[in-house]
Amino acid sequence: MDLRTLWDQHRAAAWPKFSSSSEGELMTLDTVISGCATYYFDERSLDAPRLLMLGHCLDDLDMLLPDVPEETGEYFTRLRTLAGLLLDAARTT
């Protein structure tokens, strides 16, 4: 799946309903990654601070994903895939 299609799917998805001690952190990661995606599609690139921030988001998601409730797995796995594709695309531009 290409980056644009995945981004469109993610934007159309509703925030999952769940209760977790990580919910606030996951919401922040979703917001930051979405902001990077918006910037990338507007500018066709990411600057160095955003690349660094996106890398940290991926690290944080990798730590949190094993503990997200099963019913939210699709949403956050898609977010993780989106961040990885975005980072790869930005590094090649």
Describe the role of every protein-language-model region.
Residues 68-93:
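Amphipathic alpha-helical binding modules
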Residues 39-44, 61-68, 90-93:
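Secondary-structure edge/capping motif, primarily at the C-terminal ends of alpha-helices
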Residues 11-59:
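Amphipathic alpha-helical interaction modules
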Residues 7-9:
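Short helix-onset patch at the extreme N-terminus, typifying the N->h transition
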Residues 30, 55-58, 62, 77-80, ...:
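Generic structural concept
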